[in-house]
């Protein structure tokens, strides 16, 4: 495989550059990337340290830096080394400016914007933590999304990922031969999504979990027939109520969350007046 070095340089968390890099790398199966993360680069001294690293390990540079002088220094340095230096969002900003007719603001503030979106995200994260694994079922009416599924079908990490996108998400496990919460008998406005997985894959995940916890006796947890029944029962519950079901067998958490968000916003837009 061809090796590729990528330097992610940002005056913030490098998350934007990282997401862009991973999206691009997904198109190349024969590349073996090595990513270097350089977050919180907000002055010339910090940038100088990064430049020395870039010089010692040539590769593509992806950056999100607001300060004009730092950008100039970085791009000039890369130009002299004859390596690509790409601004992840400059093209987007330029097109927004052209389309809206509003000039790009020159003064940048490094502080996060403490607006409604910021606090909505904090509230969503808090909600996801407090309503994990079937907790506080009496507060489901405050959720945007409710996930149901057998244990170890990525309900918790998916809930947290959705919360980081501002969506209050509760998750409820389905356990074989245990009564399911009676909320399913009610007419609710929240989006309910069932998560299922290939039984063999789920057994592998559960066995790994038990080994990590050094638990030797929990036969029902990894019994094929029971695991299969759990997945089938979740499908049945959802199909009877026209709730969507997602098979997460071959999906990453990001992919699962993206599908859920698409369903959520399609539903929201459909009923928006």
Swiss-Prot record:
GO molecular function, a single term: ADP binding
What this protein catalyses is: N(tele)-phospho-L-histidyl/L-threonyl-[pyruvate, phosphate dikinase] + ADP = N(tele)-phospho-L-histidyl/O-phospho-L-threonyl-[pyruvate, phosphate dikinase] + AMP + H(+); N(tele)-phospho-L-histidyl/O-phospho-L-threonyl-[pyruvate, phosphate dikinase] + phosphate + H(+) = N(tele)-phospho-L-histidyl/L-threonyl-[pyruvate, phosphate dikinase] + diphosphate
Q: Write the protein's name.
A: Putative pyruvate, phosphate dikinase regulatory protein
Signal sequence interval, chain numbering: none
| Functional note | Bifunctional serine/threonine kinase and phosphorylase involved in the regulation of the pyruvate, phosphate dikinase (PPDK) by catalyzing its phosphorylation/dephosphorylation.
**Origin species:** Rickettsia bellii (strain RML369-C)
Q: What class of enzyme is it?
A: transferase
Pfam families xrefs: Kinase-PPPase (PF03618)
Q: Which HAMAP family match?
A: PDRP
Which keywords belong to this entry?
Kinase, Nucleotide-binding, Serine/threonine-protein kinase, Transferase
Q: Write down the superkingdom of origin.
A: Bacteria
Binding-site residues, ADP: 149-156
Disulfide pairings: none
Give its E.C. classification number: 2.7.11.32, 2.7.4.27
The record's listing under InterPro entries reads: Kinase-pyrophosphorylase, PPDK_reg
| Family of the protein in this entry | Belongs to the pyruvate, phosphate/water dikinase regulatory protein family. PDRP subfamily.
Q: What is the lineage of its organism?
A: Bacteria, Pseudomonadati, Pseudomonadota, Alphaproteobacteria, Rickettsiales
